[in-house]
A protein has these predicted regions:
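Extracellular and organelle-lumenal recognition/adhesion modules and their flexible linkers in secreted
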Residues: 1-279
Length: 279
């Protein structure tokens, strides 16, 4: 039987605190002695490309990179942006965010991206506006990563348009539309050396007027402590922590013959950051 069991390879089944293996010989699933734990909910990209939330203790099968899927195991992280869900709740802007300047004719509207709420700013006439997170407190002298997904087919902007600024955090930094990669991702690593309190401003008018008929659309903003970005953590009023995924007790005599056997695994690291990894 061991030669016919596949964990993954496009065939996944999960239940609370465990994974199931697919038996390609008879087309059903068999339990394996994997112990899986995570004491919090978490998000994952499903087969339809949508970001969905799974409950505490439920293994995450992520389809971000291909149709086969992969078991996603991540360290504990927190999203320090207090209102990342960008919910307008019938208003004219996302809850918890403030509009800065507000010069000229402009609008903000609710969009949807990968099953999550998004925001689109339109600068109708020449003027200036942006969305501000409000005060955020993070740990000084520690590397952090900011990741924002821009919806490129909804954006009308020039490469040199300024779209993001850090206020305080020990330094004033501005990023341009050209800093977004071809997939619409803006990912920034930074280290607040002195001041651990600041805010983020996102929009076409973060530091100067923008010409009319331009737009900027974005979603799932996340600011976390660490040298690389992890899966999205929704927040609605305060920072939220996702607890680490833990999966162990694999490859024992219940799966492999007690005297010999081979365990084959395809594994991809979340980041090449020099930390130790064990299989």
């Amino acid at each position: 039987m061991a030669n016919t069991l596949n964990l993954g390879n496009g065939n996944w089944a999960t239940k609370e605190d465990s994974l199931l293996a697919y038996n390609s010989e008879n087309g059903n699933y068999k339990p394996l002695p994997f112990d899986f734990t995570r004491a919090s909910s978490a998000t994952v990209v499903n087969k339809d490309g949508l970001i969905e939330t799974v409950g505490s203790g439920e293994a995450r099968i992520d389809f971000s990179n291909d149709a086969k899927g992969a078991l996603l195991l991540e360290p504990s992280r927190s999203n320090y942006i207090p209102y990342s869900t960008l919910d307008f709740d019938g208003g004219v802007k996302p809850n918890g965010w403030s509009i800065g300047f507000g010069i000229g004719s402009y609008s903000y509207e609710q969009l949807t991206y990968k099953g999550q709420k998004a925001v689109k700013q339109t600068q109708i006439t020449t003027g200036r506006s942006y969305l501000d997170t409000g005060s955020i407190t993070i740990l000084a002298n520690t590397e952090h990563t900011l990741k924002i997904q821009f919806i490129l087919n909804e954006c009308v902007a020039d490469a040199n348009d300024n779209i993001l600024s850090f206020i305080s955090f020990g330094a004033f930094a501005i990023y341009k539309f050209s800093d977004i990669d071809s997939n619409g991702v803006l990912e920034i690593q930074f280290n607040p050396l002195s001041d651990n309190v600041g805010s983020l401003r996102i929009g076409l008018g973060v530091d100067q007027n923008a010409t009319g008929s331009k737009s900027l659309a974005w979603a799932i903003p996340q600011l976390e402590q660490g040298s690389y970005a992890t899966s999205y953590i929704p927040t609605s009023g305060s920072a939220v922590t996702r607890v680490a995924d833990i999966c162990n007790n694999a490859g024992n005599e219940q799966v492999i013959n007690s005297t010999e056997g081979v365990l084959y695994a395809e594994i991809s690291a979340l980041a090449n950051d020099g930390t130790e990894r064990y299989v």
